[in-house]
Amino acid sequence: MGNKESLLIDGLKKCGLKEEAIPTIAEKMETYINEIILFNSAYNLTNTSDHDELVIRHILDSYAGYKKIAELAESLKNLGIEKLQFADIGSGGGLPGIPLAAAFPEIEFTLVERMSKRCAFLENCAAILGLKNVKVLNKEAEKIPAESFDLITFRAFRPLDQKMTKTLLNMIKKGGFFVAYKAKIENIKEEMSGIENLIKEYQVENLLVPGLEDSERNLVVCVK
């Protein structure tokens, strides 16, 4: 195993993924990283094309929320929902949607992205990686039909203002969740104070990203 592969595999273990699934997921993610590097300059997918930075700042950052999202998925299944519908809003290059879809093959993932060229990239990645549980929707978040999804994720997306929060709440089914990947707790509190009329309660889960131990990362979980 080379240093590049071990960086990813060690990180996946630390993020709590199922041991038996890690080799397959790691192989898919290495292929995905290669696709990002190949198309990044043309599609402006991420802020780096360096392999190790992509592993740490994007793939492992996405998987740092794995355990919490697995817990939320289990709680939704306990409500009797047979086929969970998740969405990644403003998916861009597919983060965290593609990594999460690879880890939860039993859950349907919709990657929502308004830019058509990025949608073409996402469709290509889903095909190459064999992610049969992924579909790509070329649409503005505001145009998603009401109560379409059980859980939505977003990362490096717009701030949670009044308009965006109403849009997100509208597309989630009753009892569903939206999960935001965010940075500093001070900024989160400021954002959430501006929408306290819409979100009465929320949970902040501190994320430990392997390789980014000195950077503050949090997951904000809101329930409808």
Question: Which residue ranges define each predicted feature?
Answer:
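Conserved class I S-adenosyl-L-methionine
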Residues: 80-92
